[in-house]
UniProtKB/Swiss-Prot annotation:
Keywords: Cell inner membrane, Cell membrane, GTP-binding, Hydrolase, Membrane, Nucleotide-binding, Protein biosynthesis. This is Elongation factor 4. Residues 4-186 form the tr-type G domain. GO terms for biological process: positive regulation of translation. GTP binds at D16, H17, G18, K19, S20, T21, N133, K134, I135, D136.
């Protein structure tokens, strides 16, 4: 097909602003699916995506649209994940397009994630078409939404398209705007092959399926291709386009988007953002912007039932087939048995993986408190990276500790600013910027330690702003912090699963909160059980679970005091001996409760 009739575009929207519904309408209008095949949110194939109303993986769909000028155009919609954990995937999806629809909810206006992705699109030089959705709602305010697009994003919104994706009103105008405003792709089918991978998934029959946008050149069935980053070579076995059903074709040329199957065994071989080229006639340079995805948040995952350990390993291996950004390694804990130390892109990513393990593989799991990776310079000037409290070096060997930080953009209404400022101060944030986007909407930019965000920041932000704040963040390097390892000891023995890394200034409060919570949860024994919080050898907080005792004086009616004293002394001796040899079983609830302590302390 002539490249001047191809249009590649993405949809940028905040969660719940109607991106997947709009995609459904576009598919319906262009006749890509029959009425029988339509179901809500066609592109969100995972149950979890439908339920949470989020898009996790990027998809692409080819639609043929006969415009009002009687020309048939090929429109490639490249679906993007909208959540902050997957922002790198979004940036690669946007790099595959020439245009983007910026969808804003008429009743809610611009939110933080929309902003972050809109900036990405502007930086990629995309033609942006503002669309105001949900105008059928009684609370819709189109003028305010336009004002916010102009104030926050800096786009001219006077020609913004008012639509309702639910009823289909105004959706045809979007297709016409895409045809007339989005530029056709550049590129020459005769140049050496250069294609951008923007998604991949694992198919149990065909191996890895790659979604790619061909920037230069042509790829055909039977070609030998090479991945630029690792120089691995593969033979193209089949290729095609999604309409959203897969349709096989013989070749893809510059400007087109499609899938390639090339007998690739694992997703780990295929980096999102990598460049595909021919082995015989390679391109001169890779496409810009490729980076290896690194896990940011770490947690231990254990099964409640120790016998399910092998099932957990199999489940993790299957998930890893489809998700190269997720990593795991075996670890064992005295308290919880065998499990895995897992790395995730962020909190949502962690929740999704945990939920998929429980739902698809029917496992009962315990997750330890999430933490981040610290860079520690030791006294002998060597540098190590630690993401697990059990590997934390002795404090006498540490020269300095650096923790990862993020830049957070928070959009909210001005009446909630006070509560939010208090929250970010408490989380050790440093203010970078404070500006009014419109009359009453404020954008705060803060630098915060990632460690403070992983526990409960998002939930608390929602509660102090009554749900009116939205958050977007990206990594911003590291800063030096006095972090310490907080150990919890029960009956004099350290419980490894409860150790956490905390900032020195908060260690005392966190220790107090943990031991008092543990005291409520550990059942009374026949001897007293001390519960202590310690930093190194220094005990900073202590609670005691009192012993249960039998009334040994019950059978003494009156009688001499020395007789009573003798019985009490004898009981005391017995308790002492039990305390020396007694073992305390810590119930499962204690671990789960401790993970929740961070939410209130």
């Amino acid at each position: 097909m002539d490249r001047s009739f191809i249009r590649n575009f993405a949809i940028i929207a905040h969660i719940d602003h109607g991106k997947s519904t709009l995609s459904d309408r576009l598919l319906e209008l262009t006749g890509s699916l029959t009425a029988r095949e339509m179901q809500a949110q066609v592109l969100d194939a995972m149950d979890l995506e439908r339920e949470r109303g989020i898009t996790i993986k990027a998809h692409s769909v080819r639609m043929m649209y006969k415009a009002h000028d009687d020309v048939v155009y090929q429109l490639n919609l490249i679906d993007t994940p909208g959540h902050v954990d997957f922002s790198y995937e979004v940036s690669r999806s946007l790099a595959s397009c020439e245009g983007a629809l910026l969808v804003v909810d008429a009743s809610q206006g611009v939110e933080a994630q929309t902003l972050a992705n809109a900036y990405l699109a502007i930086n990629n030089g995309l033609e942006i078409i503002p669309v105001i959705n949900k105008i059928d709602l009684p609370s819709a305010d189109v003028e305010r939404a336009k004002e916010m697009i102009e104030g926050a994003v800096g786009l001219d919104a006077s020609h913004a398209l008012p639509i309702s994706a639910k009823t289909g009103m105004g959706v045809e105008d979007i297709l016409e705007s895409i045809v007339h405003l989005v530029p056709p792709p550049k590129g020459n089918p005769d140049h050496p092959l250069q294609a951008l991978i923007f998604d991949s998934w694992f198919d149990s029959y065909r191996g890895v399926v790659i979604l790619a946008r061909i920037k230069e050149g042509t790829v055909r069935k039977g070609d030998k291709i090479m991945l630029w980053s690792n120089k691995h070579q593969f033979l193209v076995e089949e290729m095609g386009v999604l309409t959203p059903k897969p349709v096989a074709i013989e070749q893809l040329e510059a400007g087109e988007v499609g899938f390639i199957v090339a007998n690739i065994k694992t997703v780990a071989d295929v980096g999102i953002g990598d460049t595909i080229t021919h082995v015989e006639r390679p391109c001169l340079e890779a496409l810009p912007g490729f980076e290896e995805l690194k896990p940011m948040v770490f947690a231990g995952i254990y099964t409640v039932d120790a016998h399910e350990h092998t099932l957990l390993r199999e489940a993790l291996e299957k998930l890893r087939l489809n998700d190269s950004s997720f990593f795991f390694e075996p670890e064992s804990s005295v308290a919880l048995g065998f499990g895995f130390r897992c790395g995730f892109l962020g909190l949502l990513h962690m929740e999704i993986i945990q939920e998929r393990l429980e739902r698809e593989y029917d496992l009962d799991l315990i997750t330890t408190a999430p933490g981040v990776r610290y860079k520690i310079t030791l006294t002998d000037n060597s540098v190590i990276e630690v993401d697990n409290p059990s590997k934390w070096p002795d404090s006498t060997l540490i020269e300095k500790i650096e923790e990862p930080i993020i830049t957070a953009m928070i959009l909210t209404n001005e009446e909630y600013v006070g509560g939010i400022l208090k929250l970010v101060e408490e989380k050790r944030g440093r203010q970078k910027n404070f500006e009014y986007v419109t009359g009453s909407r404020v954008m705060l930019t803060y630098e915060l330690p990632l460690n403070e965000i992983v526990l409960d920041f998002y939930d608390r932000l929602k509660s102090v702003s009554r749900g009116y704040a939205s958050l977007d963040y990206h990594l911003a390097g590291a800063w030096e912090s006095p972090m310490v390892k907080l150990d919890i000891m029960v009956a004099g023995e350290s419980v490894d699963a409860l150790s956490t890394i905390v900032h020195k200034d908060f260690a005392y409060d966190r220790g107090r909160a943990l031991v008092s919570k543990m005291r409520e949860l550990i059942p009374r024994q026949m001897f007293e059980v001390p519960i202590q919080a310690a930093i190194g050898a220094k005990i900073i907080a202590r609670e005691t679970v009192a012993a249960m005792r039998k009334n040994v004086l019950a059978k003494c009616y009156g009688g001499d005091i020395s007789r009573k004293r003798k019985l009490l002394e004898k009981q005391k001796e017995g308790k002492k001996r039990m305390k020396r040899i007694g073992k305390v079983d810590i119930p499962q609830e204690a671990f789960l409760a401790v993970l929740k302590v961070g939410e209130n302390s």
